């Protein structure tokens, strides 16, 4: 496959310019105006940040992208899907409140926010995975698949399970419904935390496989042989008593995530933007953000999310670690087994290259790229 073009700009701003100006110019240089958006719904997929985390992308960046879409006649909306774990984004009401508290609402972003998989995280579409090896279909939030055009706006940072979180993670994991996230993280089966179960029987009413019964203490019990892994019981429980069995090894998670991302992007116009700044060691899903492991690097954009992630990863690998950080502390530890890899030296139990390998294998894009500085 021919190398893809990735466009890049740094964060330097002479007097009279701004970062939002630079992002706008970058998107235009990378070709966003070549997409026919007239009268079309445009999903702008991003992460609104968990409450307490301050490393997520500012809403000002989202407004730049939304304004460009509207200038081209598009109807943009910001979107994300509900989380699998308990937190401030596990259902649409709390998710919208979290987004608003973190600054995402029409006055700041220029468009509406829609939680793509609905109130309980169960409003999904099963989408075929092109050339899928680990997943034949992907469970994707309905509003994302209803959009005519898909744009990812990603905060590129470290990640404790996948090495880094960039475009592919934002798309693959982020667009999965709660059941889709469970399939990626696990064998696809949930379990019950008995002390949280209230015995309300709501989960059993939602189960289409007759897999849930109740023990002598009126606590839910899931028959794993009957369970189909649809995840509706997780959405049904108001008390966070049902959770996913996170038994997938990190490499399997990486590969499933890449296949989910390929399903989202297949057969429609897409465009991808990543900002490599506030490079925290872990996911923005945390309710905190540790000190950045690397200095701010720049903004990247491309039609190819695989090339985009590879370019961002390479830039991070070539950056100097910051001393007062998880990465810097690890490297300064006597006897540390240095991997000469900023992601792996920050979180040693990861295999980040598997994501890019699988994404390329299923035809989502190429790791080969040409970098053009705007």
Model-derived features: positions:
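Terminal amphipathic helices with adjacent charged low-complexity linkers/tails
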Residues: 66-67
């Amino acid at each position: 496959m021919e190398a893809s073009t990735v466009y890049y700009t740094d964060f330097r701003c002479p007097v009279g310019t701004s970062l939002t100006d630079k992002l706008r110019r970058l998107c235009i240089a990378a070709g966003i105006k070549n997409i026919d958006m007239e009268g079309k719904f445009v999903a702008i997929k991003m992460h609104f940040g968990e409450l307490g985390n301050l490393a997520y992308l500012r809403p000002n960046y989202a407004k730049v992208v939304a304004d460009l879409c509207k200038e081209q006649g598009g109807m943009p909306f910001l979107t994300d899907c509900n989380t699998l774990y308990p937190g401030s984004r596990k259902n649409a009401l709390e998710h919208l409140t979290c987004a608003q508290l973190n600054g995402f609402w029409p006055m700041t972003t220029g468009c509406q926010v829609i939680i793509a998989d609905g109130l309980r995280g169960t409003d999904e579409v099963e989408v075929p995975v092109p050339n899928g090896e680990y997943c034949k279909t992907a469970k994707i939030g309905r509003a994302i698949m209803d959009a005519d055009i898909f744009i990812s706006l990603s905060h590129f940072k470290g990640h404790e399970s996948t090495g880094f979180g960039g475009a592919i993670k934002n798309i693959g994991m982020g667009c999965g419904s709660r059941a889709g996230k469970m399939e990626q993280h696990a064998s696809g089966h949930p379990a019950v935390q008995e002390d949280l179960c209230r015995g309300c029987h709501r989960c059993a009413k939602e189960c289409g496989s007759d897999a849930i019964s109740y023990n002598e203490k009126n606590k839910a019990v899931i028959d794993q042989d009957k369970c189909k892994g649809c995840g509706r019981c997780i959405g049904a429980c108001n008390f966070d008593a049902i959770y996913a069995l996170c038994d997938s090894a990190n490499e399997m998670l990486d590969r499933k995530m890449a296949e989910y991302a390929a399903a989202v992007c297949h057969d429609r116009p897409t465009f991808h933007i990543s900002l490599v700044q506030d490079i925290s060691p872990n996911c923005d899903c945390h309710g905190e953000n540790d000190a950045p492991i690397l200095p701010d690097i720049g903004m990247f954009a491309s039609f190819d999310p695989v090339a985009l992630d590879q370019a961002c990863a390479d830039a991070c690998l070539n950056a100097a670690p910051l001393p007062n950080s998880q990465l810097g502390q690890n490297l300064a530890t006597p006897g540390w087994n240095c991997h000469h890899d900023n992601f792996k030296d920050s979180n040693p139990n990861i295999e980040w290259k598997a994501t890019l390998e699988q994404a390329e294998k299923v035809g989502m894009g190429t790791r080969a790229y040409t970098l053009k500085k705007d």
